[in-house]
Amino acid sequence: MHKASSSKKSFDDTIELKKNEQLLKLINSSEFTLHNCVELLCKHSENIGIHYYLCQKLATFPHSELQFYIPQLVQVLVTMETESMALEDLLLRLRAENPHFALLTFWQLQALLTDLSTDPASYGFQVARRVLNNLQTNLFNTSSGSDKNVKIHENVAPALVLSSMIMSAIAFPQLSEVTKPLVESQGRRQKAFVFKLARSAMKDFTKNMTLKNTLLNKKTSRSKRVSSNRSSTPTSPIDLIDPIKTKEDASFRKSRHSEVKLDFDIVDDIGNQVFEERISSSIKLPKRKPKYLDNSYVHRTYDGKNINRDGSISNTAKALDGNKGDYISPKGRNDENNEIGNNEDETGGETEEDADALNSDHFTSSMPDLHNIQPRTSSASSASLEGTPKLNRTNSQPLSRQAFKNSKKANSSLSQEIDLSQLSTTSKIKMLKANYFRCETQFAIALETISQRLARVPTEARLSALRAELFLLNRDLPAEVDIPTLLPPNKKGKLHKLVTITANEAQVLNSAEKVPYLLLIEYLRDEFDFDPTSETNERLLKKISGNQGGLIFDLNYMNRKENNENRNESTLTSNNTRSSVYDSNSFNNGASRNEGLSSTSRSDSASTAHVRTEVNKEEDLGDMSMVKVRNRTDDEAYRNALVIQSAANVPILPDDSQDRSPELNFGSNLDEVLIENGINSKNIHSQTDALADQMRVSAVMLAQLDKSPQQLSESTKQIRAQIISSMKEVQDKFGYHDLEALHGMAGERKLENDLMTGGIDTSYLGEDWATKKERIRKTSEYGHFENWDLCSVIAKTGDDLRQEAFAYQMIQAMANIWVKEKVDVWVKRMKILITSANTGLVETITNAMSVHSIKKALTKKMIEDAELDDKGGIASLNDHFLRAFGNPNGFKYRRAQDNFASSLAAYSVICYLLQVKDRHNGNIMIDNEGHVSHIDFGFMLSNSPGSVGFEAAPFKLTYEYIELLGGVEGEAFKKFVELTKSSFKALRKYADQIVSMCEIMQKDNMQPCFDAGEQTSVQLRQRFQLDLSEKEVDDFVENFLIGKSLGSIYTRIYDQFQLITQGIYS
């Protein structure tokens, strides 16, 4: 019996060995792809050795290919439970090699944490939090700590392997070189402490930790007496006799007075407890302005120190008092806590800061809210206060101008002793990279903030408010910012640099609650790098070391003279002072802006003058009621009342009056002001900058008027109309020209891609992309640079773009297969940059417009030219092709027809395999070469509009398309059929790759397209019809896919439904 068992075991080992040999041979073969590697990571997650080897293989692929699979790598990291640390180490290693990889991974993890936060105890949340913590520490921290000196924890398996390696190295020295990285990687894995009491003692453990902190802070020796006298508390499992022991000793020593049974089932719980005590509080996220103002953040200021509610001195104040000679990174209030946390890890001992941290962390979440992280300057300004103790609401209001100046002085004094000549090259490079990551994340946050502000502005004033906000944002450009993924590939070691946003070309895309907007961004290709020896970077390092760039893209500060002084020489200096929109002298006859509130004010009442005084004192007008407020402070409520009171005093004009009250007439005399001050670029920029500030204030007034009391309802409408009229007048002063007036844009419904570039070069659709680009270059102050370029992107907030990004990834994978198999089809490779769970940037399609807009514009023109009946007639795509490409027998038309056929075949197969729904003409684009492309993949795979399978056809193939292709007997249609067959058969060869991409992403994924769970990939595989022969596949495509789609009644009904409900032309 024993021999049979031993023989069976030997046989199994032999089979396992052969499998491993075959796997090794596959991995090392030339045909092994990156996708194969990601797929094997999922299958062999339980084997640490194989998992480690696969991760080492991953590192050999180019960074461009690795960036493509970042969503899958992150998904594997958080969903595949494994003891291996190899993938986590690989991601941290790649972030040091490629800044784009670091940013994309950071944003992807940040978005995933939003989903995982519903279950903080899950494996995925713990891993994502740990990796995000490490990423933030390395990306935003400028300290010279070494990543190599990482503590190896008490892990038995790596320790045994290490011991064996040392012994075997005597006979085989090369073994240590191979095994050492694996041992170090696994040794860093956080392990739980096994010497812990039973599960029922967890609550007592927390109470005892709090008691221990209190006793240590008071430095008393009453620990035994207090512990024994607390009859309401069970016997303490913590021995506090020797206070110099470490936290781990004090927390996990067995009590000498009672015998406690050990329960090893709670190992993971204790590991989580230790993790939260020592690590979670040090998570550092980029500074983000608070969404809500909460009274829970009120603390006392006394002698320059922030006093928490429990009476302990905050760590921020201690850092300011005790580390004045050290450099402190200007990233946020949590930085000081992180430094304390790092010191604790290095020394292993306890300090008063440790006690405070433990006491406070018990009441805080493990993952801080991005919107509640305060700028470090808030603490600095508090620390600079002197005099008697007083309460200071340090987090309820943004900084005033004086507080901002004081904070910059404090920050400057903290870092002025840094000598750049004493820093190593590595430290300088790290400072440059940290500055780049800070600028990137702050820029993304600023775009999100603008969208949130626009959502609170009336629809009519959104475009004016958008241009004002973008003009203010431009004050911090040029900056070390590029747009990963969306901009063209960089040269090795170089990055693109954003220089300005063309504010007068920006567009609000629709009037929905979520306000996406179009940006045209000017940038210089391959403009900057991280070489600390270059002249430009030397100046930048001086700026960073002097802490001059602490605030960037911060829309809360309206007076930015200090920041403008530090801008690059190529940017224009902004105006020093700002006046309020309530100051009627600001733009009258070019009067001096320094007069402010003079004795000759045109106010009709003392209350109005009082409002002006308050407004001039409060510089941060941009935030006034632009966000929803929880637990409003008294000051905010008071200011709101003053605004309403001021609005009530604005005289109501008769209907036949053309004049505005002086308070609202801030834009009429702009030309006079510019002429009086002298027509030069600096003055024009300065005056327009001031105008942007005042437009923001007008937007604030509109938001306030919408909340006005009932007794003011009659006057509010008139005042509101006056403000909007003034804003539109200023909007014209920015150089904006309405596309409706210029190009006869089709209809009121501006779909997102209709304003991307201006559209195809025809008389009824507008200028093409090349013309627009050249026009902007001629008027740009950076257009003379040889590496100048222009890009258009859509900024979205409030929508989860990860599903659409996954769709574009799948389409690009299919396009790569078609290129490899030499199938002559065309696909637009769209890109999306995810910056959080509900924000992102979307690439636009240049020289393309939706079929809806083309039809509507052409219909209007044909009716005007009497070529179409105005009673129900609608222009067709063939009419558009005839006007755009000429004679049907000409080369230009035939080429456009061929382009239409090749692109239609590709998207037909894509729509069938991915089950793309909502295929109305607003989501189908035609470019200036005749190519068709689909956008908006909000409904695909498992979900459909209204959860109803309304679109039953495999893809959209209308009679209009057939007419454009020359009919069912036309050569173009026959080519379409053949290309559809070829493209479908080519994808069938790589069905496993496409299905596995779906399988990896569907696990524990909350995106709507994965509502069917595991059945999502099963159904996708079924659509490939892998059981059919080649001949049967041809029949399936021609008779089922094309035959069922051609002129489908379901397609016609859905188009008619969209026409009736949304006004989208069918």
UniProtKB/Swiss-Prot annotation:
Q: What is its EC number?
A: 2.7.1.67
GO CC annotation terms, alphabetical: cytoplasm; membrane; nucleus; trans-Golgi network
What residue spans carry the region label Catalytic loop? Answer: 915-923
Q: What does this protein do?
A: Acts on phosphatidylinositol (PI) in the first committed step in the production of the second messenger inositol 1,4,5,-trisphosphate. PIK1 is part of a nuclear phosphoinositide cycle and could control cytokinesis through the actin cytoskeleton. Involved in the response to mating pheromone.
Tell me the organism's taxonomic lineage: Eukaryota, Fungi, Dikarya, Ascomycota, Saccharomycotina
**Protein location:** Nucleus; Golgi apparatus, trans-Golgi network
Show the segment(s) annotated as G-loop. 776-782
**Subunit field text:** Interacts with FRQ1.
Domain PI3K/PI4K catalytic, first and last residues per copy: 770-1049
Record family assignment: Belongs to the PI3/PI4-kinase family. Type III PI4K subfamily.
Q: Where is this region: Activation loop?
A: 934-958
* Composition bias type Polar residues, residue spans: 374-411, 570-597
Any Pfam family: Pik1
Modification Phosphoserine occurs at: 10, 236, 384, 396, 592
The name on file for this protein is: Phosphatidylinositol 4-kinase PIK1
Q: Check the UniProt entry and state the signal peptide residues, or none.
A: none
Spans of biased composition, class Acidic residues?
Answer: 342-356
Ranges of Low complexity compositional bias? 598-609
